[in-house]
Amino acid sequence: MKMIYLRCKKYKINKLINLKNIDELGYKEFENTIYVRFHGKVYTLLELKPEDKAETVCTHILDEYINNSMTMDSFTIDVDDILKEIHDNK
């Protein structure tokens, strides 16, 4: 069973996502949120502050998923590391 452990100290979240049942992982630009869709229902994973762009964070999460999903059944995505990388590149 494929699982993602999503954690972020800045936003105080620790979430385990079962990828078997997921229909969609994406972002809502106007709300600056990252969400998942399970069986037609949308659940917000992360509400970001304006300086942390949901599009960029979501792209990094999807890249991590693509890079790890073929070789590992479960893996951790640390959103703090993604945010640090984004802000260091500014």
Question: Predicted segments — roles?
Answer:
Residues 1-16, 20-90:
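Eukaryotic intrinsically disordered, low-complexity regulatory linkers and tails enriched in Ser/Thr/Pro
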